Amino acid sequence: MSSLPRRAKVQVQGVVLKDEFSSFSELSSASEEDDKEDSAWEPQKKVPRSRKQPPPKESKPKRMPQVKKNAPQISDGSEVVVVKEELNSSVAIADTALEDRKNKLNTVQTLKTAKTKRKCAAQPHAVRRTKKLKVDEETSKASYLEGESNSSETPSTSTVWGGTCKKEENDDEFTFGQSPLKKIKTETCPQGQPVKFPANANHIKEEVEMNWDIVQVLSERTNIEPWVCTNTIRLFNDDNTIPFIIRYRKELINNLDADSLREVQQTLEELRAVAKKVHSTIQKIKKEGKMSECLLKAMLNCKTFEELEHVSAPYKTGSKGTKAQRARQLGLEGAARALLEKPGELSLLSYIRPDVKGLSTLQDIEIGAQHILADMIAKDKGTLDFIRNLCQNRHVCIQSSLAKVSSKKVNEKDVDKFLLYQHFSCNIRNIHHHQILAINRGENLKVLTVKVNISDGVKDEFCRWCIQNRWRPRSFARPELMKILRNSLNDSFKRLIYPLLCREFRAKLTSDAEKESVMMFGRNLRQLLLTSPVPGRTLMGVDPGYKHGCKLAIISPTSQILHTDVVYLHCGQGFREAEKIKMLLLNFNCSTVVIGNGTACRETEAYFADLIMKNYFAPLDVVYCIVSEAGASIYSVSPEANKEMPGLDPNLRSAVSIARRVQDPLAELVKIEPKHIGVGMYQHDVSQTLLKATLDSVVEECVSFVGVDINICSEVLLRHIAGLNANRAKNIIEWREKNGPFINREQLKKVKGLGPKSFQQCAGFIRINQDYIQTFCSQQTETSGQIQGVAVTSSADVEVTNEKQGKKKSKTVANVLLKPNPLDQTCIHPESYDIAMRFLSSIGGTLYEIGKPEMQQKINSFLEKEGMEKIAERLQTTVHTLQVIIDGLSQPESFDFRTDFDKPDFKRSIVCLKDLQVGTVLTGKVENATLFGIFVDIGVGKSGLIPIRNVTEAKLSKTKKRRSLGLGPGERVEVQVLNIDIPRSRITLDLIRVL
């Protein structure tokens, strides 16, 4: 504490004292309530023990200013209201003094701000400017400490988070950033400026209030620090997209990658869905008049749908009611409570009613009281928390076996597929995700029977803890009453708690496995989308086939269709068709053939390989490659394909799509629904809503970071840019067709439906080619003297005027755009243009040197002289924003980071499966990545499998170790053959290295 400022010290100490004496006051108030309410019984969290509390120390007013003294007292305004766990007490849902405390907190913050302003006003202007960043940093630290001390959360630097928090490694442009130098927090979106967080930083007010803090639960489930979760929630609440956050707000999320950010977003949506479901269920039960205080408390504590189902199932419409409900209707709840509160005065014989069913005998009375007690135990939060924590440290396994069904009902092939799981048992902490998905599929097909097994020691320790601690009667209980209590515990565990735990374990395992499967699908899709393009080539696309022939399509280097045809290579006409193929290749000077991997792919590949080996296509040096044709047939009959290639046969459209997948994979694959690309694992078994949301987000991420040229890109590609959708993309294309090309980014504000938020999200990912604009401007100037709506001057700034559109009210639009801005061809966001201009002035550069070697030399020399931190401090910005500016100024205009990824593997010959031998070293291309291994195409017609145990970090390069750039489709690898199973066509490989 010695390193803290004086104000921070006083506040932290004050909070500790308040927390200590608040617990003392709660105990004393609880004892007073017990005396007043005839000693109402409640479950005991700990063994009763006499404890002395030290008297509170009164602080001296002279040593502590009034603001500091009140700070700890009003800090509760940011805390989540805690509901007391009492069976007979009213549920506190809202704090009546909450608003007053918030008002006091705002007053204190206002006083601090005013005091800071007075100090700054007393300093000279030059001094204030040089020390501004330092003051902001100190204030940010003090605010962070104050916020942490006022909340119930553990600070991010404590040992609790030390072993669990995600730590991202330094990354390149694609995973977007390096580790931040410090944690900078903000309540609003910064404009490239260093920011600070308010005192109640970790408090997020949700529309639906629960008894748990959404920030804390989100942090626990994702293993991400609370301050990062708070920032992320605020960013998502402000409608920021993942690409925008990753590139331009990375200091607020501690450099998380896109996959981690998507995980936070999905978990946040799940928690909010649970909260909404809880409150809708509460309203339904209230209308039926079945709501009680204990039920309300239990429902507001629910964090999952399984917990809510467990609590609310007996109260659903049409339910026959539980055994406990029927016992309560008979009036036995008083007997059950008396057993815990006043066992010495309880007489079960007084409840006997010979003419009432369920009360006719003493045994009926005991069973009814037992059912009520079992229900109370199974719905008590403290009890459920204890049993869950107990299971985490004990042996809990999942078992699967062959289902006892007749062979007529189950396909024998399905039984053979699940041979590994017919006698399977594994600890739930060690089981793999793909095993869970396989077991679930077998269970759905009625092939397997699955159960969760909890060791008997868990039950014994649970019952012992309940008797001695949580559910111990207040006074001495007779042996027959203790027998009822023990029977209640056994009944509660066996009939209620055990099934609940099994459902929770299965649901958690399935949820985690589905999420990992979806994440793997997303990573594979990213690798495919970011495959390096092959520009500047004329390509022949081949869609193989037998009876209907092989469809051919030749496209130009600009993706224009030059020729289409059909050849029959596998119907005895191979020699005749070879001459036609040769003439086509020679006429269009095409030396690259792209073959789809569908039906007849192997035979078509052998056909072309044989002709190439015979040098049949001389003087052309022809090569070929195999590309996935997944989704090509679906796209060929879609309305978009009909609009793009009208009048062309759908089969020939597939050949065109296959060729374009090599020329520009991203531009072609975005036309296909992601789930049809087919690079996943169990993708048809997982939540389709989650799968679609994740894959759409991955497509948006890839398209945004590659960037698009607004004046030549297609509508299909444009709709996947962050902040845009189908309607906005359509409006942009219509504006471009009506008014000509966009001169700079500011003109986007004139497009219908593109508001300030949409412009903020998309502007940094839209590029404007300056050479194209200069050519267009010169042509327009020669013909008409002035570009429509654009006056060209020497200024680099932009003036905005109001343009009235009829009688309707219109937004302020850019009517006069003074000239093209060279910064519009970079990844620099318009909000940082002012900082970029000041940086250029500092290094002595100009806008016309962007992307040139001279600019790179000036930047390097300036960085060596000053350093990143000093430059960022001088420009009053963050290091991350400065890095984006440096990258934007250094990268050439034609920069495409996809060139760092692997290109298609072009071949001239073919290898057969029979030619392989154990120990042979081959090079191949990753075809698919799953949770259990990597499938590699080694050119023998059947993919080999690298088991996941053979993919170690030592064999991966530094960039491949990152989660977002894991080994995936398109990667070239060197492998060694470990085993060959020719009858089953299986090849086992070992990874040597990544090429």
Curated annotation (Swiss-Prot):
Keywords, alphabetical: Coiled coil, Isopeptide bond, Phosphoprotein, RNA-binding, Ubl conjugation
Biased amino acid composition, Basic residues: 116-132
Cross-link for Glycyl lysine isopeptide (Lys-Gly) (interchain with G-Cter in SUMO2), residue positions: K84, K134, K166, K167, K183, K185, K955
A single GO molecular function term of this UniProt record: structural constituent of ribosome
Keyword Transcription regulation part of the UniProt annotation: no
PROSITE patterns xref list: S1
PTM sites of type Phosphoserine: S861, S964
Record region (Disordered): 23-78, 116-164
InterPro entries linked to this entry: HHH_9, NA-bd_OB-fold, Ribos_protein_bS1-like, RNaseH-like_sf, RuvA_2-like, S1_domain, S1_Tex, Tex-like_central_region
SUPFAM superfamilies tied to this protein: Nucleic acid-binding proteins, Ribonuclease H-like, RuvA domain 2-like, Tex N-terminal region-like
BP-aspect Gene Ontology terms: nucleobase-containing compound metabolic process; translation
Residue intervals of the S1 motif domain: 919-992
UniProt cross-references to Pfam families, sorted A to Z: HHH_3, HHH_9, S1, Tex_central_region, Tex_N, Tex_YqgF
Keyword Coiled coil: yes
Protein name (Swiss-Prot/TrEMBL): S1 RNA-binding domain-containing protein 1
